[in-house]
């Protein structure tokens, strides 16, 4: 079987009376048109048409095999360029079933293709590569650990940093929601909306002791611990510094809603984290 | 001609920003308006924990001056002192200013709960003010 990277395939499609040549290298297409008005567009250049609003890999213009938890293909058909040709991006040599232009090598009726070009371009949100963020996060913690005199000081720095981020981020997320006079509503918001924005999943478990003002949040697959590896012979497998920032995020979010709290956490098994929020009376 | 005074009040009831539309208000009158706004803060605090809405409508009156309020999720209070009652315009004004405030808040160089000194923010608020009032 030949290596897909060594043999780039060139397909020609007739789009609206213009011939478009498409180079597909390793399943990632960069559209190239021989018409004068159409610019050469790489997958990364298409990000100019989109807006950022989340912290995850889904729909990122970078191909899927560079991503974590990415399972949707980036469908750019129907985007009208100055030359009039629709751009299309293929990912991992799989053509999306929703793709109006079909497989690149096939001819389709001109009328149908022109209808496709007249459709308005729906912008997909440009998101951050999860792997890039995780590498950055690991480096950030490493830098803070090295610049701190002891572990306690490092944890304080991370907590403060998380507090600032959580405080500002939750203000942005609650733009379209109502105020939270009730404590439970604020915690539910953190479990659903806040957690989904940061980790692309909701909290797996929420236990409450409403009278005592204690809430226990369980994340059974904590994303920022999943890709850490340990030396099997090492006796110390403490990775609490990788979770301290998240504890700060929760504390900052709760503080923004007007509830002062203490957030502690416990790491169970490999990547299960239990966060305990205790409201200060 | 009716005047509008817009204030942003921080979490500890500290003033973050103040502007008047149109900018023809006398010094003497400015102090009176600040006094009225200060007096209405307790009423805002009461309303916040009772209501789910960010826009609290008209919360207080002093002679001809009416005070409308809007509270963000982070309990930053927007107050507008006005004489004319135009709820739609006031609500839209608050929503647009809230959007601007969020952009300021997400700026890493802005320190939370400190006075807003950005000239760009000031210019945009003026623009929104002239649009609605």
UniProtKB/Swiss-Prot annotation, chain B:
GO terms for cellular component: cytoplasm; endoplasmic reticulum; Golgi apparatus; nucleus; perinuclear region of cytoplasm; TRAPP complex. It is found in: Cytoplasm, Perinuclear region; Endoplasmic reticulum; Golgi apparatus. It comes from the Eukaryota. Pfam families: Sedlin_N. Its main location: cytoplasm. Keywords: Cytoplasm, Endoplasmic reticulum, ER-Golgi transport, Golgi apparatus, Transport. InterPro entries: Longin-like_dom_sf, Sedlin. GO terms for biological process: endoplasmic reticulum to Golgi vesicle-mediated transport. The keyword tRNA-binding does not apply. May play a role in vesicular transport from endoplasmic reticulum to Golgi. Belongs to the TRAPP small subunits family. Sedlin subfamily. Part of the multisubunit TRAPP (transport protein particle) complex. This is Trafficking protein particle complex subunit 2.
């Amino acid at each position: 079987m030949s290596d897909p990277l060594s043999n780039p395939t060139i397909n020609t499609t007739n789009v609206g009376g213009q011939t478009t040549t498409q180079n597909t290298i390793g399943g990632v297409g960069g559209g190239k048109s021989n018409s004068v008005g159409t610019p050469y567009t790489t997958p990364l250049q298409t990000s100019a048409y989109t807006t950022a609003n989340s912290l995850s890999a889904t729909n990122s213009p970078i191909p899927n095999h560079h991503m974590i938890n990415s399972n949707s293909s980036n469908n750019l058909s129907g985007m009208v360029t100055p030359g009039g040709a629709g751009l299309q991006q293929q990912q991992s040599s799989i053509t999306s079933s929703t793709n109006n232009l079909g497989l690149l090598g096939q001819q389709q009726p001109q009328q149908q293709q022109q209808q496709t070009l007249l459709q308005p371009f729906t912008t997909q949100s440009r998101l951050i590569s999860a792997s890039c963020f995780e590498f950055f996060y690991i480096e950030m913690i490493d830098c803070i650990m090295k610049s701190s005199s002891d572990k306690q000081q490092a944890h304080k720095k991370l907590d403060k940093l998380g507090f600032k981020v959580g405080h500002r981020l939750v203000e942005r997320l609650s733009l379209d929601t109502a105020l939270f006079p009730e404590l439970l509503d604020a915690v539910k918001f953190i479990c659903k909306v806040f957690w989904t924005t940061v980790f692309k999943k909701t909290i797996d478990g929420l236990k409450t002791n409403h009278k005592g003002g204690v809430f226990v949040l369980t994340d059974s697959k904590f994303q920022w611990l999943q890709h850490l590896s340990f030396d099997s012979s090492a006796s110390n497998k403490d990775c609490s510094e990788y979770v301290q920032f998240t504890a700060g995020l929760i504390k900052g979010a709760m503080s923004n809603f007007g509830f002062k709290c203490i957030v502690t956490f416990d790491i169970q098994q490999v990547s299960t984290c239990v966060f305990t929020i205790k409201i200060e009376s | 001609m009716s005047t509008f005074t817009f204030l942003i009040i921080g979490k500890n009831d500290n003033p973050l920003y103040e502007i008047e539309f149109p900018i023809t208000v006398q010094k003497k009158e400015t102090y009176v308006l600040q006094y009225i706004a200060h007096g209405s803060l307790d009423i805002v605090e009461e309303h916040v924990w009772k209501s789910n809405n960010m826009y609290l409508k008209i919360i207080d009156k002093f002679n001809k001056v009416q005070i409308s309020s809007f509270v963000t999720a982070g309990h930053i209070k927007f107050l507008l002192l006005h004489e004319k009652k135009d709820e739609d315009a006031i609500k839209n004004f608050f929503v647009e200013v809230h959007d601007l405030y969020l952009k300021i808040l997400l700026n890493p160089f802005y320190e939370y709960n400190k006075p807003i000194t950005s000239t760009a923010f000031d210019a945009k608020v003026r623009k929104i003010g002239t649009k609605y009032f």
